[in-house]
Amino acid sequence: VLTFAQLSDLHLDNGPRATARARQVVDYLRPLAGELDAVLVTGDLADHGLAEEYKELADLLDLPCPVLMTPGNHDDRAVYRQVLLGQAASQEPINSVHDIGGVRFALCDSSIPGRDDGWLADETLAWLDSVLGDGPSFVCFHHPPVLLHSWVDGIRQFGAERLEAVIARHPGVVAVLCGHAHTAGATTFAGRPLVVCPGVVSTLVLPVEDKREHAPGLALHVLDDERRLTTFYRTVV
């Protein structure tokens, strides 16, 4: 059994509101972190892609378990690489693969520098195809590749049929995990569950809902030995 948390859309800006909400969620997670197999963070880590924002993030997410991160549309690839990865500045996609407890996490960079919508570059899709094996795996990125019937649909991940073709070749893919929508959600993509993580900095509501403030949220995922994924959503007040 693999148990891990997912956070998304922290939008840290060195301001009091974003910091306080992120700290609420991390303070909730910290006592659990010794029992968690990982913490996954699916993009929009920083609000402006500044070095000081990533430094705040690194301090905040200093946890006793692996922390896996992938960029979103508010992140800056060059600064992200320098501060979080200790690499030379580059605008190439930031893709990474992590094996935890016999499960593979393929983290894909769906961001497009200077834009809010998403797209997986051809090189990213080729990389993804090469790292997905026969064992259980998660495909993770920021932008959802499907319509969610909210205003983020206009800035979703486009070219989804290309990704669908890759996933179709790999039956070991358990689920697709993403963020960007600032709300908890679940649907399907390529015949697999697609799980959307709630936002930390804010919650975006459907047109039929009242536009009021919501508490920050996170997802807790449990993958059992039969490769069944169960997701629990938590709000932190």
Where are these regions (language model features)?
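Active-site neighborhood of phospho(di)ester-bond hydrolases with catalytic His/Asp-centered motifs
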Residues: 7-8, 37-44, 67-73, 109, ...
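N-terminal active-site segment of His-dependent metallophosphoesterases
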Residues: 1-59, 133, 148
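Beta-strand-turn-beta hairpins that frame and shape the catalytic cleft
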Residues: 1-5, 97-107, 132-138, 188-194, ...
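Short catalytic/ligand-binding loop motif for oxyanion handling, primarily in non-cytosolic enzymes
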Residues: 49, 77-79, 146-149, 185-187
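Binuclear metal-dependent phosphoesterase catalytic core
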Residues: 7, 17-23, 166, 185-237
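Surface-exposed cleft-lining segments at the edges of enzyme active sites
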Residues: 13-14, 46, 110-122, 146-154
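Active-site-proximal segments of metal-dependent phosphoesterases and phosphodiesterases across multiple
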Residues: 135-174, 181, 205
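Extended active-site neighborhood of metal-dependent phosphoesterases/phosphodiesterases
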Residues: 50-127, 162-172, 190, 202, ...
